[in-house]
């Protein structure tokens, strides 16, 4: 994918998606592209390490942070072959669905608008990740 800004804009055309980020996880654990001014632009290398690390038990019990926002994990198949998606929900009064998909070199992180069901984001992430995998990203 040459132009991530165009990709981010295309993803944000879906009115159910509030924020999006492309984050490296293989070579460079930082945000490659995101919605300007969005919460997901603040995803840290430490958060990427927790998401992709081998210790799944700890964050399944205690939750995790995405862009500094605390989340509870609903379903974790991020490291599973053939799936590669994690579903979570932010904590607090403004709870939103968060979905993380894994491609060979990058994570795709989506946050839905308030009231959008996580299953919708999950389906969208699966479709987008399939495209990223074909591109080799």
UniProtKB/Swiss-Prot annotation:
A UniProt-annotated Pfam family? Profilin
Any single GO BP term = regulation of actin filament polymerization
Taxonomically, which superkingdom? Eukaryota
The tissues where this chain's protein is expressed are given as:
Testis specific.
Task: Identify the SUPFAM superfamilies for this entry.
Answer: Profilin (actin-binding protein) (SSF55770)
Keyword vocabulary terms for this entry: Actin-binding, Cytoplasm, Cytoskeleton, Lipid-binding, Nucleus
Q: What one GO molecular function would you report for this record?
A: lipid binding
InterPro entries from the UniProt entry:
PFN, PFN_euk, PFN_sf, Profilin1/2/3_vertebrate
Entry's localization field:
Cytoplasm, Cytoskeleton; Nucleus
Gene Ontology CC annotations of this record: cytoplasm; cytoskeleton; nucleus
**Purpose:** Binds to actin and affects the structure of the cytoskeleton. Slightly reduces actin polymerization. Binds to poly-L-proline, phosphatidylinositol 3-phosphate (PtdIns(3)P), phosphatidylinositol 4,5-bisphosphate (PtdIns(4,5)P2) and phosphatidylinositol 4-phosphate (PtdIns(4)P). May be involved in spermatogenesis.
Q: Which family does it belong to?
A: Belongs to the profilin family.
Q: How does it assemble?
A: Interacts with ACTRT3.
Q: Which PANTHER family does the UniProt record give?
A: PROFILIN, PROFILIN-3
Protein's UniProt name? Profilin-3
**Organism of provenance:** Homo sapiens (Human)
Output the lineage of the source organism.
Eukaryota, Metazoa, Chordata, Craniata, Vertebrata
